[in-house]
């Protein structure tokens, strides 16, 4: 069974396609546009690749198993969103809000998490190669079993972060922090 198309997904009596068209109009500052509020929307197992969700409200949305490759999610509110096994490769999530989101087993390589709120996010088993976490809040995040190869954690506070079972040998860590010191803490 393939992924669902945006036009077949309904939220608040409208198709997701209509909502995203109005959001794109809003984002470009044109008359008649409306910011997308997809709070609690079920967009699981959907093809949403390359879509513009910049500044959208996606609180508690279910995006599990969805294809979001190359989507624009900068400054989006994904608080508590379900992104389990979602494909987020090469998305821009700069300055997005994701506290309590579930990104377990997500394919999230190449993401910009620059200045994001990732507090208490579940990254267990996620693919996070070449990810930028600079200046992100990752307090309380769980990375157990995640792949953080060549990830950037510079200028990131690692207080309360669970990095157990994570190979940090190629991860760029904050100044003065070593992989050995972090593994002793786990």
Question: Where are the model-predicted features located?
Answer:
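Tandem repeat scaffolds
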Residues: 5-18, 24, 28-186
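Long, contiguous interaction/recruitment modules in multidomain scaffold/adaptor proteins
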Residues: 1-2
